[in-house]
UniProtKB/Swiss-Prot annotation:
GO terms for cellular component: cytosol. The lineage of its organism: Bacteria, Pseudomonadati, Pseudomonadota, Gammaproteobacteria, Vibrionales. Its EC number is 2.4.1.18. Keywords: Carbohydrate metabolism, Glycogen biosynthesis, Glycogen metabolism, Glycosyltransferase, Transferase. It comes from the Bacteria. Disulfide bonds: none annotated. It comes from Vibrio parahaemolyticus serotype O3:K6 (strain RIMD 2210633). It holds the Pfam family GlgB_N. This is 1,4-alpha-glucan branching enzyme GlgB. Pathway: Glycan biosynthesis; glycogen biosynthesis.
Amino acid sequence: MSSQRWLWRNQHSVQTNIGSREKDLKITKTKKIKKKHERAYELLAEAAYSDPFAALGPFIDDGEGSLRVWMPGANKVELLVNGEPRVALERDGDSGFILKEQRDLHLTHYRLAVDWNGVEQIIDDPYQYHNIYQEYEHLHTPKDMYHYMGAHFVTLERGGENISGVRFLVYAPHASAVSLVGCFNQWDGRRHPMQRLDYGIWGLFIPGLEEGVQYKFELKGPNGEGLPHKQDPWGFYSEQYPSFASITYDHKRYQWQDAKWQNRAVTQKRDEALSFYELHAGSWKRDGKGDFLNYRELAEQLVPYLVDMGYTHVELMPVSEHPFYGSWGYQPVGLFAPTSRYGSPDDFKFFVDACHQAGIGVVLDWVPAHFPSDDHGLANFDGTPLFHDPDPRRGWHQDWNSYIYDLGREHVRRFLVSNALYWFEQFHIDGIRVDAVASMLYLDYSRSHDQWVPNVDGGNENYDAIATLKWMNEEVYKHFPNAMTIAEESTAFPGVSAPTFMGGLGFGFKWNMGWMHDSLSYVKEDPVHRKYHHNTITFPLVYAHSENYVLSLSHDEVVYGKGSIHNKMPGDEWQQTANLRAYYGYMYGQPGKKLNFMGAEIGQTAEWNHDDQLQWFLLEYERHQGVQKLMRDLNHLYRNEAAMHDQDCVPAGFEWRLQDEADASILAHERISKEGERILIITNFTPVPHERFRLGVPNVGQYELLLNTDDSKYGGSDFKVLTSVKTEKVESESLPQSLELRLPPLSTVFYKLHK
């Protein structure tokens, strides 16, 4: 019998490199064949077979052709070929079925009619598709990994037919067997064993699967031990508790409408006005029943609000799928799936799309430092510590009770870098804020002296993490030049936002945690005591240009008993709000990009609660309306005046005018644009007004009032200030001319120079 009449396979040649087979497959006769697959059937029955293409589908055995099918629980199986009569397969053991040569059949593509206790199901046999699992060298490139790993919709051509389905690939090098389970096979691990391929990858193509199908992987450990069902590490969509199943999803379906945004010119982000609104999607607002807004509802309400308030970007706390809502997303399991708490991946794309069409950028918090120990996730994925170091001194984070990614392994680095690139490409995001960078950089982070392992040079720097962060930044900026990466890094590690070719980590920006800590520490003091802490508020300017900084008042400052930003302020209600307004004015006048957590703009009085929406009812009160109006005007002032932002990251954009007036707790400085425009900013951190305050300035001209945080429209005292003031030839602060100003209590005022 000619082997060219079948798509035969030799069972000894398919373990890792399944050979090609003929397109035109014909069955001429069925012959009696010997049963050589008892052991294979035993392993299939235990969902422990790693080489299913050696025993299932059409192949040649001792010169004889046969078609074997493994269908546990089936009563009867028949072969269906277009234009040919049905052919019944004979039973071959408890769950196996075999076709013996009895008649001529032209078999380039076939289906199976399976009888399940009287209910017939037509199945396209996955084990006839053996030549689509090839060429994995491209998986060494992070940009390509997510185009292949996980579940992808593909279309094959067989016998003139287009066969659509889903190709599954998963990395589990130490597993002894992997099966695909899901609603399509009643979660039966015996039904769809996956093929062990090269590079530790397992694969299987399931014809006919559509979007919205739940699935997981059933793995056997290195010694054959059963493991918990695992979510797809590359899964694009997943269910919530209790199943946590992955869901098939096709990224090609969504039709983006943000071409204008995506095609905008590449700009230098350091020179732009960047004002981030940090947001937790589950607690910004709730619907009338107290339930979450979905991504589309959130877009409909949030986007016009951001535009009106003058923010340039929304920064979302992690949306990667996370099983525990109370982690706020910082314990992610599904790094490639936007959480389904708020809708589908298409819904999240709609959210990003709506932001872009309105001119709002989208930044995501990204968590590459650690991952939780949930059974369905990455923890001991293939029965071994595949993604973390087995030594708890390097692989376990004591503060967060989570595993630390082992960045010394190439597959872990690729997995994470691929994930960062994925969000930019597939969801059109504009930036990532990398969480907990300090915990990655230092081997002894939050550890006692005997709980960490030094690097090869005996030091505490994590060389693998440093290399990974550099690589991630290089890849992001190479493929997405308009992107930005931001580090949450709380130490003095040098060059966080310096380019990698200059020895830096390559981030675009770094949160200024020192400014946040020192400035909040200062404003918490009663005004009468602030003069004793004057150095605290001025010290951040010593290092203000050592990195490309973002001044951040993030969610971390309004949780765990810290109270709200508003309630950190001393005094009675009026003084608290006045202090808050003066502080916000001071923040916007400082060099650095701006970030405020949601609720700050309305003067939220309660600590943030992720189980409830913000205190929007506060806007019934004038003083909270005033805070909101002020934040709106500060954002627009910051964006509209080049002096306020285009030299944020260089020393030339800032000059002190008054630094040492500790007794009066008054600070004054000028912001300077590239074109030489100047804005004078003066903050009075006491409730004492000044009728005639003289301040030396280097330029002659007229200063026009731009904004006064004590204005009555913001809820201020409405102490009368000069809307226009001209320099006088009166020496002050060693300068030949000066201004005589009226300074309101607890206020920040902005004046623009007109020469």
